Amino acid sequence: MADLEKTKQIKNIEEKAYELGFDGFGITSPKIEKAGENFSKWLSLGFAGEMQYMARGEDKRRDLNLVLENVKSIICLRKNYFTEEKSMDFLKFPDKGDISLYALNKDYHDIITTRLKELEKTIQSELVDCRTKIYVDTGPILEKPLAEQAGLGWVGKHTNLLSQDIGSWYFLSEILVDVELPQSEMAENHCGSCRSCIDICPTDAIVSPYVLDSKKCISYLTIELKGVIPTEFRKAIGNRIYGCDDCQIVCPWNSYAVKTEEVAFKSVDSNFLLIDLIQLNEEEFRKRFKGSPIKRIKRRGLLRNVAVALGNSNNPKAVPFLIKALEDKEPLIRAHIVWALGELMGSKCIPILDENLAKEKESIVLSEIEAVQDRFHKNS
């Protein structure tokens, strides 16, 4: 009788999840020993780069009892954000910035958190006196291994979660519960011998199947990294100004992707002309990207990325705008502008940089100027 009651409760919770717009529902145990070991090894290899929050939350990621005492079950949820077909054709338009598909929409954290809170009410109503904790990739939780255990998909060689029915274009979220619930069947891995994601990566960030060196990943370089983008990766970034979808674009399983019915995830902005973006002031940036995930990297982060993309654009029309941007108040932006001018103008940029050198005080900008000067002096 108790089992029948529990089954009915789970059915009601699952139905509510789908009613709220989630596309996948599964339940698993909080025990992830192997994934925890792999995570610690990944950290020890330095693959987290400057994402120090990863190491700070290591203990909690490996033991979810430190997140919710006496946690017994994890309800894993999937939310499709696929809005439009995407191909590698964006590389044919170097004057336009490429944005990760998920970031063309409103910030998913706000949308999904609201839905999770609604589902949380249903859980607490069905499972009386239970304690819960919700997450939308913002806390110390190994959500992809958990989602794999919960049957929502398998972790692919690119380290994204894949499913046979909708590919990988979706967000994950979780609700921790201190009640023992029947577990879903774990998903099987269907990557086989495919290497498409590994071979397409512009920076060779997938150092081996299922292992990503974040320090090389363009998503890390354009979003997580707060400082200067290492010179050796700038050409490979191309016109990608927020994230990178290459490994997902070429994945065969994404041919099964189904467009989301979520109105909030319909693309709200797709015009990212680099010359327009490099001219954005602080107020214009805030207005344009209000409610967008892009606001996370702030104006200085976005224009840093735009400067790199302009350097890769082979567009001489960008030069006057880059020269003007040498006066930007943000040293991080100015530093990458210097590199971009070197790429577009060659040695002709030296007089401009020499003039700027006399008034520049910031070390990161001075280093870039000296690097460009050295490069062309050696070649002269």
Name the predicted role of every residue range.
Residues 233-267, 284-295, 301-308:
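C-terminal amphipathic alpha-helical segment
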Residues 1-190, 359-363:
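Auxiliary alpha/beta "docking" domains used to position bulky ligands
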Residues 196-220, 226, 240-264:
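Iron-sulfur cluster-binding cysteine motifs and their immediate structural context
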Residues 299, 329-330, 361-362:
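Short inter-helical turns and helix N-cap capping residues of alpha-solenoid HEAT/ARM repeat scaffolds
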Residues 183-192, 234-242:
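Immediate flanking context of iron-sulfur cluster ligation sites
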Residues 284-288, 315-327, 346-358, 379-380:
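Amphipathic alpha-helical scaffolding segments comprising HEAT/armadillo-like alpha-solenoid repeats
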Residues 303-313, 334-346, 366-379:
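Structural detector for internal amphipathic alpha-helices that build alpha-solenoid repeat scaffolds
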Residues 161-186, 214-233, 281-283:
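Short, charged low-complexity linear segments at domain edges
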